[in-house]
């Protein structure tokens, strides 16, 4: 496979992925863009340091369960992977939950007591910018093309 063909295939996969994320955002109020954008400071591979003074985030599910979010491990077009407090451990235990977006009913964000916490935006971390052409193609890519 030539380098040009490899780049074309990678671009095609990126377009398909962008289309899948766009469909997920359209279908659910709290889709991938919500978690990557508004809660972007929680996307990481570890629990936040208390000195960061991040807000408290609780995800309320359709089945009545409420998840206290420590951090966001990752997102896919169908679910978000969350590290949440494990109530059964009666301590500092964590559980990894894969939650389908359509199960999420409500998100509660509360500032911590004391100094003001920042919710959603960070001036120190630049967001990833997706060019308009890629977004437009992802938005109009027919479903049957994105399945390949």
Kindly give the residue locations of the regions a language model identified:
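Eukaryotic short linear interaction motifs
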Residues: 67, 77, 89-91, 106-107, ...
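Short, compositionally biased strand/turn segments
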Residues: 43-46, 50-51, 73-91
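Phosphoinositide-dependent membrane-docking surfaces
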Residues: 98-110
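Short amphipathic beta-strand/extended segments with alternating polar/hydrophobic composition
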Residues: 68-71, 96-101
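Short glycine-rich, low-complexity segments
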Residues: 1-62, 113-148
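Surface loops and adjacent helix of pleckstrin homology
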Residues: 71-72, 85, 109-112
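Amphipathic, interaction-prone secondary-structure segments
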Residues: 56-78, 83
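Short aromatic-glycine motifs in intrinsically disordered, low-complexity regions
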Residues: 53-60, 86-97
């Amino acid at each position: 496979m030539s380098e040009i063909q490899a780049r074309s295939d990678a671009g095609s996969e990126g377009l398909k992925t962008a289309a899948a994320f766009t469909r997920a955002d359209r279908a659910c109020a709290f889709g991938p863009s919500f978690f990557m954008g508004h809660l972007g400071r929680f996307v990481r591979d570890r629990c936040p340091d208390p000195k960061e003074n991040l807000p408290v985030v609780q995800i309320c599910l359709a089945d009545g369960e409420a998840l206290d979010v420590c951090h966001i491990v990752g997102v896919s077009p169908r679910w978000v992977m969350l590290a949440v407090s494990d109530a059964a451990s009666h301590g500092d235990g964590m559980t990894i939950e894969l939650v389908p977006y359509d199960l999420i009913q409500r998100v509660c964000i509360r500032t911590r007591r004391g100094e003001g916490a920042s919710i959603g935006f960070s001036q120190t971390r630049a967001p990833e910018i997706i060019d308009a052409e890629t977004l437009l193609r992802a938005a109009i890519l027919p479903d049957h093309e994105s399945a390949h």
